[in-house]
Structures are given as structure tokens and as C-alpha cells.
């Protein structure tokens, strides 16, 4: 079979002006970035606000293998299948970070015959959103350092600046740096560091803001440092929220592209789900809901991370909760959770599927806690055997969860028809009655304990010395009513990435809390989650090139 980029480059793209007409968007409603990309205007988003929202389908997954389980591919294939069935459908997905594209992924626009296009542009600079977020973030860093240099009227303690610089690349050498070295004219020397752009609070803010006014308010509410007497310093104290909003005035507009089958797609924002809330923008999802009868969206990594955050953090900012949740599972991942070594995953092993099913079963049970109907999608791989597929289907039937095999990677929309029919049937027959896991009035401690015991199935939560102190401080600052966003490994329910399957009787340790008051949540740090990834021994970048005619090579 052709590579992803070969398939993408073989497709005759339709002008984006034609694609968007399918959902009632005119040429005057968009701002073109070439022939095949556009941004949606504020005027159009405002005009559709009164529309009744359509059905919302959330795609999530089991705890993934390092290669991922195909959520984006499944989301795209499902949307294409729904459109093939005559349902007016839109996609609402995250945009890729250049760091993982150059590092391990090599691309993140779907795969096979379930891709969003133009995939080369989407995977590289797209419409410049990532650069705008990077610029806004680093402008704030420069303004903080300038405040120190120009007399430090706010009394900022340089040792307690928590705002870091960012870069949209994987660069481990920048995790910890010292800035301001040299003569006094170069600034105040202090420790600093870089995160990857998608870990920036500004990325989370962009994805949760409902309009420019809300964006400006959220930017003003960012905590950047503490004073010498340990009081928080906000962006509003620096009086630069207007400038940051100005930098982001176009980046906040959702991007319009198309799938291989011509399904309109809104691709906007891309926070990671292991260190942030892992969902595309509220503006993109809300607008898609008001333009289409069905909206398909995804949440990053497994349901214990992205879906939990979607349901507890994002949904309160949306016009409605999901009508159905699709959990993507692969037999290779289930076998890995069942104890099979990565090198042996291609061999048939029904017993390992049975053992690994405990992971999928827990995710199904977790999503059912939110009172939303669940469907399991088996993402088919070439090495899957009939016996393994039959084993998994039988196990799903035992817990009374609908299950369908989907081959959208190999067969595109046709490979997702059975799944699409089941999802539509479930939505029609089972009304969602969304219930949040916790209340805003719960303390931070109670929220963390709820997530750990009810979603991870952990025994208890251990709060480290710093976290214990912060629980008291954050309550004093009035931050204890915010939602919790757990920073945790994506590979396990626990904070130990090697503890696969469905572990029980484990503790989760919260070593520190990080206030993201602009985004509107508090991050709980567990384990050793990195906010600036490194590159692998053989980065995907080594296979990339460009032909003399400008055609991209090596993206996959």
C-alpha cells in the first residue's frame, strides 16, 4: 500500500470555497490561506450562535502503545462514513505540533485513506497558529524580564518566576537554561527553561476561549510569578494582556480544511493530553456543532487523560455534552496490556487479548460514569486474526457494549460505514444524560481523589510536601474551585508507565500543583512527565526532504 504522503498527494483537492458550502459557509465567511486552507470569520461564528447544536461524537482510546492507536484516523474515517450515509458532518480536530512530527510521529493528520488535507501544510506551518502562540508566550517572557530590568516595581522574585519560554520543537537541551548572562545591560540573570509550545498555557487558553473578549480576560488572569512576599503576579499586573491578544487575533479563528473524501474539517489548537487538557478549541467544536448535524471530535491519548479532561474541563464551555463516546482499541495494544512483548505483537494470541481486555473494560466503565453511551471501535491492522477479532467482540458483548470493526486506514469511508451506523443507532436509541465527575465546589484535594479513585482505580493519593503547601496557598488565593488537569503518563492508569493493563492497589503521588488560572484549571504533576520532549535516536526528520518542484517527501 502507498505511504500516507503518497496517498495524500494523489488526491485532487477541491477548493476550500467549495468544501465549506456543504455546511452553509459562503466565500465571504472565510479568510483564505491559499486555495485549500481558510480561517472562519468572527462574523460567521457569531451568526450561527443561535443555531441548535447537532449531535456530538467524542472519539477516545484505550491506553496507547508508543505508536498510538489511530484516534485521529478513526475520527476522520467515521466522519467520512457519516457523510457517505448522507449525514451532514464536520470534523473538529487538533492541529499537530511540529516537535513530534519531526521526532517520532512523522505526521499527525490521520493515515491511509482517512486523512485531512493538505497534510503537508497541516503537519508543518499550517496557518501559523503555533508560531503566533509561541510569539505571544515569548513576548510575555521578554516583558517579564524587561520589568525586572526596569526597576521591578511589582517586586517580582526572580527565583519564583513560573512562566517559561516555549518552542514548537523537541529540544531537551533547552529544558533548563540561564538567561540574562553577560553585562548588566543584558538583564537580570536567572534560571529559566523552555517548554514545547503545546504545553504553553496560552495554547490551553486559545482552546478554551469563546471569543476575543474572553481570550483577553483569560490572558489577563495568567499567573506568571510570585513576589518577594509570595503573592501571585498576574499578566494584568504587567498590563500587557491587550498586546498578547493582538498577537493572537487571527490565531483564535478556527482553520478549515478537507478530508480525502471532501468532509469539511475544523483543525484548531493542539494541547497535549498528558500535560494539558488535550482537546481542540471550544470555538471550533462549538461552531461545528452549529453548522452540522453530526460533529466528530477527539481527545488526546487514552480515555483516562483526554476524555476525562474533555468531559470535566471542556464540556462546561461547550453548548452541549457528547451524545456518544467511541473508544478506539487495537488488538496489538490489548495484547501489550495482556503481557506480550512489543516484538511479539504480530503473533496470534487470543489469551493475551482476554487479559488485555481489562484495560478496555475499565475505560468503558469509566466513560459510562459520565452517563454517555459508549461504542467500541476496533481499529483493524493487517496482522489481526479472525480468532482475535472474534475474541474481542465476544468480550465486548459480555459487558453489553456495542462493538464494530473499522478499516478506515485501508478502505476509507467504506471501512467506517458499519461503525457509523452503530454510532447513529446508539445516539438515536440511548439519550445521553451527562454527569460531571466532580463539582466546582469540591476542594482541589477532593477533585484529585475523585479522578484517581474513580477513573484510574487507584487506592489512594499521596500529596508531596510542596503539593500539601500549595493546597493551602491555592485555597487562600481562591483557586481551589477550579477544575484539576492531571499531568500523567499516557501509557498506564497509574503514574508508572510500565504498569500496563488494569492495575489496582496503587497510589498516585502528586508532587506539585501548577496554576493555570488563565486557562481555568490547576495542573497536578505526577511521575516524571516532561513538558519539553526530546528527540529519539533516529528522528523522523532524517527521512524528510523536499523535491526540486517543492513537493514534500518523507512525511508519514
Swiss-Prot record:
Swiss-Prot/TrEMBL catalytic activity: (6S)-5,6,7,8-tetrahydrofolate + formate + ATP = (6R)-10-formyltetrahydrofolate + ADP + phosphate
Keywords: ATP-binding, Ligase, Nucleotide-binding, One-carbon metabolism
Gene3D superfamilies the record matches: Domain 2, N(10)-formyltetrahydrofolate synthetase, Formyltetrahydrofolate synthetase, domain 3, P-loop containing nucleotide triphosphate hydrolases
Cited PROSITE patterns: FTHFS_1, FTHFS_2
E.C. number(s) listed in UniProt: 6.3.4.3
Binding site for ATP: 65-72
Pathway in which this enzyme or protein is active: One-carbon metabolism; tetrahydrofolate interconversion
Gene Ontology biological-process annotations: tetrahydrofolate interconversion
GO MF term (any one): ATP binding
InterPro entries associated with the record: Formate_THF_ligase (IPR000559), Formate_THF_ligase_CS (IPR020628), P-loop_NTPase (IPR027417)
Pfam (any one): FTHFS
Family: Belongs to the formate--tetrahydrofolate ligase family.
Name of the protein: Formate--tetrahydrofolate ligase 1
Organism: Streptococcus pyogenes serotype M4 (strain MGAS10750)
Gene that this sequence comes from: fhs1
Amino acid at each position: 500500500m502507498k505511504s500516507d504522503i503518497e496517498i495524500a498527494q494523489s488526491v485532487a483537492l477541491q477548493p476550500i470555497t467549495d468544501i465549506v458550502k456543504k455546511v452553509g459557509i459562503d466565500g465571504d465567511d472565510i479568510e483564505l490561506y491559499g486555495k485549500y486552507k481558510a480561517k472562519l470569520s468572527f462574523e460567521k461564528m457569531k451568526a450561527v450562535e443561535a443555531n441548535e447544536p447537532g449531535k456530538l461524537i467524542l472519539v477516545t482510546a484505550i491506553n496507547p502503545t508508543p505508536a498510538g492507536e489511530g484516534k485521529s484516523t478513526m475520527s476522520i474515517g467515521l466522519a467520512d462514513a457519516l457523510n457517505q450515509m448522507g449525514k451532514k458532518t464536520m470534523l473538529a480536530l487538533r492541529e499537530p505540533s511540529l516537535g513530534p512530527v519531526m521526532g517520532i510521529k512523522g505526521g499527525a493528520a490521520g493515515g491511509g485513506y482517512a486523512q485531512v488535507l493538505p497534510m503537508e501544510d497541516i503537519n508543518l506551518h499550517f496557518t501559523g497558529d503555533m508560531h503566533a502562540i509561541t510569539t505571544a508566550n515569548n513576548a510575555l517572557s521578554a516583558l517579564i524580564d524587561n520589568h525586572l530590568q526596569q526597576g521591578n516595581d511589582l517586586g517580582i522574585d526572580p527565583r519564583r518566576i513560573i512562566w517559561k519560554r516555549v518552542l514548537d520543537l523537541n529540544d531537551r537541551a533547552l529544558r533548563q537554561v540561564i538567561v540574562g548572562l553577560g553585562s548588566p545591560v543584558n538583564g537580570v540573570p536567572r534560571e529559566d527553561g523552555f517548554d514545547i509550545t503545546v504545553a504553553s498555557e496560552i495554547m490551553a487558553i486559545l482552546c478554551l476561549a469563546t471569543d476575543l473578549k474572553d481570550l483577553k480576560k483569560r490572558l489577563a488572569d495568567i499567573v506568571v510569578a510570585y513576589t518577594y512576599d509570595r503573592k501571585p503576579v498576574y499578566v494584568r499586573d504587567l498590563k500587557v494582556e491587550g498586546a498578547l491578544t493582538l498577537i493572537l487575533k487571527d490565531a483564535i479563528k478556527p482553520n478549515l480544511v478537507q478530508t480525502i473524501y471532501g468532509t469539511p474539517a475544523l483543525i484548531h489548537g493542539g494541547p497535549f493530553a498528558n500535560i494539558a487538557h488535550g482537546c481542540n478549541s471550544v470555538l471550533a467544536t462549538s461552531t461545528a456543532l452549529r453548522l452540522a448535524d453530526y460533529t466528530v471530535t477527539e481527545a488526546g491519548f487514552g480515555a483516562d487523560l483526554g476524555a476525562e479532561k474533555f468531559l470535566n474541563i471542556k464540556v462546561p464551555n461547550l453548548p452541549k455534552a457528547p451524545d456518544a463516546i467511541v473508544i478506539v482499541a487495537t488488538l496489538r495494544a490489548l495484547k501489550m496490556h495482556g503481557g506480550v512483548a512489543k516484538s511479539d505483537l504480530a503473533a496470534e494470541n487470543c489469551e493475551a487479548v482476554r487479559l488485555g481486555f481489562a484495560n478496555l473494560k475499565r475505560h468503558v466503565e469509566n466513560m459510562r460514569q459520565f452517563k454517555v453511551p459508549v461504542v467500541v471501535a476496533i481499529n483493524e491492522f493487517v496482522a489481526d486474526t479472525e480468532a482475535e477479532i472474534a475474541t474481542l467482540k465476544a468480550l465486548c458483548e459480555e459487558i453489553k457494549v456495542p462493538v464494530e470493526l473499522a478499516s478506515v486506514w485501508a478502505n476509507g469511508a467504506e471501512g467506517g460505514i458499519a461503525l457509523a451506523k452503530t454510532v447513529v443507532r446508539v445516539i438515536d436509541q440511548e439519550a445521553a444524560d451527562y454527569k460531571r465527575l466532580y463539582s466546582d465546589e469540591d476542594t482541589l484535594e477532593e477533585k484529585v481523589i475523585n479522578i484517581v479513585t474513580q477513573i484510574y482505580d487507584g487506592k489512594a493519593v499521596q500529596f508531596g510536601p510542596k503539593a500539601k503547601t500549595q493546597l493551602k496557598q491555592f485555597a487562600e488565593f481562591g483557586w481551589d474551585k477550579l477544575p484539576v488537569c492531571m499531568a500523567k503518563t499516557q501509557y498506564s492508569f497509574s503514574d508508572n508507565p510500565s504498569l500496563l493493563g488494569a492495575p489496582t492497589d496503587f497510589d498516585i503521588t502528586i508532587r506539585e500543583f501548577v496554576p493555570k488560572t488563565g486557562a481555568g484549571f490547576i495542573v497536578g504533576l505526577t511521575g516524571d512527565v516532561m513538558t519539553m520532549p526530546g528527540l529519539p535516536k533516529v528522528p523522523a526528520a532524517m527521512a524528510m526532504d523536499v523535491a526540486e518542484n517543492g513537493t514534500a517527501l518523507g512525511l508519514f
